[in-house]
Amino acid sequence: IKQLLGAGGQGEVYSVESGHKAYALKWYYKNTATRNQKEILDNLIQSGPPDASFLWPQDMIFRDYGESFGYIMPLRPQNYRSIVDMMKRKAEPSFYCLCKAAYHLTKGYHALHGKGYSYRDISFGNVFFDPDTGDVLICDNDNVSYNGAKTGIYGTPRFMAPEIVTGKAKPSRNTDLFSLAVLLFY
């Protein structure tokens, strides 16, 4: 383990090195390291990423049976910036690169939906882009599950479809499209 990269409600993310190769490790807090979460991750690892824009789980990491667990994924290159960086003018892509980023983002989610999955939590915090090329990387893919599956992930306020907020629907490919539209036109 090299350093802590960040922490959230489910766990902490570290940069790690194995065999002279860098990865990111998400380690779940004990209360979020559930059997359901492990089953979701096992499925995602087995199915593989929808396309190259996803920082997809690659392998599970365990301490001891019954203990907390985590997974490794590719480490985001430093030249990729968050959408919040762009809004704060810490990254200033050209209009052409913004259009390419929007294209790559929609193409990535289309590939995800084509595999029968929904993302469930599209928001500023889960997308990074290269301001020089418009390439995108989608992270936090442990939210992903089969379309219509019951999980505890409903989305991020301001990005959630109205039917989720009112309790009339669960997250799905269709509600992902609403969240994606909010993200693209924010």
Predicted regions and their residues:
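ATP-binding glycine-rich phosphate-binding loop
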Residues: 1-20
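The N-lobe alphaC helix and its flanking beta3-alphaC-beta4 segment of protein kinase-like domains
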Residues: 29-50
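Conserved structural core of kinase catalytic domains
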Residues: 55-101
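Catalytic-loop of the protein kinase fold
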Residues: 109, 113-131
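Activation of the activation-loop gatekeeper triad in protein kinase-fold domains
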Residues: 139-145
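Conserved activation segment of eukaryotic-like protein kinases, specifically the C-terminal portion
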Residues: 150-167
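Conserved catalytic-loop aspartate of Hanks-type protein kinases
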Residues: 176
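Short, conserved alpha-helix in the C-lobe of eukaryotic-like protein kinase catalytic domains
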Residues: 180-186
